[in-house]
Amino acid sequence: MKILVIQQKMIGDVLTSSILFEALRAKYPNAQLDYLVNSHTVPVIENNPNIDNLVLFTNEEESSKLALLKFAKKIKKQQYDVVIDVYSKLSSNLITLFSAAKTKISYYKSYSSFIYTHNIKRATKTDENCGLAIVNRLQLLKPLDITIASAKPKIYLTSEELETSKQFLTTNGINLKMPLIMISVLGSGENKTYPFAYMAKVIDQIVATTEAQILFNYIPKQEKEAKAIFNLCKAETQAHIYMHLFGKSLRDFLNLTAHCHALIGNEGGAVNMAKALNIKTFTIFSTWIDKDTWNIFEEETINESVHLKDYKPELYSGKTEKEMKPQAMKLYKKFTPELFQQKLDAFLIKI
């Protein structure tokens, strides 16, 4: 049997959807399990023992209809028995359609339902602490008679990687016996990034409470923005921030985060990666993102999160995520650090 799981686009999505492979491997130990992902997301699923092959979706297929068509025809030649389309967008619709698999599973959408043999309606509520992002993905396994209530993404780092990153930190002045906290200072876009002045206040609070060593999660092209947040911090806070120590690649970031006591900051892929490494997290949600979907494995003092809706629910009454998105920046101004100062302190003293 050959099974293809499709999850394009974001790193956090690719990591989250990787939970399907452990369940598929348990059900079909001898099957060929392949994962179709964007090439830049590979580091979060590297060394996963349940994935046989990675099928890489590149910028060429992303930007060219002709390249996408050729790619879909290549998938058809693989003769998959089952295709699970988690992404469920136009490109993956086309790939699934061309696959000619006997079993084709995805989320229900009126315009694409004819492509799939099984169309699964997303749950809108759950009592599971794993969150809706996990619950809805696991529902895609039901047509294969696989029923699981919860599953947690895992990242597989080698002992060599961990030792190399440990030496990198210690030779650059980090004391691993003292608290080390990674700050997700920037979101994936402006409307997913906590205002710089507010983030600086959060970092000030973290250092004042814990005297922790601070690392920033950013890539070289984001140095200007990261430095701007650094400059807004108090002088005594700046003395605790190791600006020059950052992951120059996604895999480097994972290895550095594995040595941290917590990751705190903007919701996004970095938070999901930290959770997959069993690192404590405190997440600040964008004002327009649905917290119920992405606050996976919420647990007091372990994985906590805050959203403006927690403190000012009247601003969201009867409004959809789509309606809130254009107001994101205006809403951020109302989402002051003082609103969750007490909750953050309670989290910090448990590190």
What spans do the regions from the language model cover?
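Catalytic machinery of carbohydrate-active enzymes
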Residues: 1-351
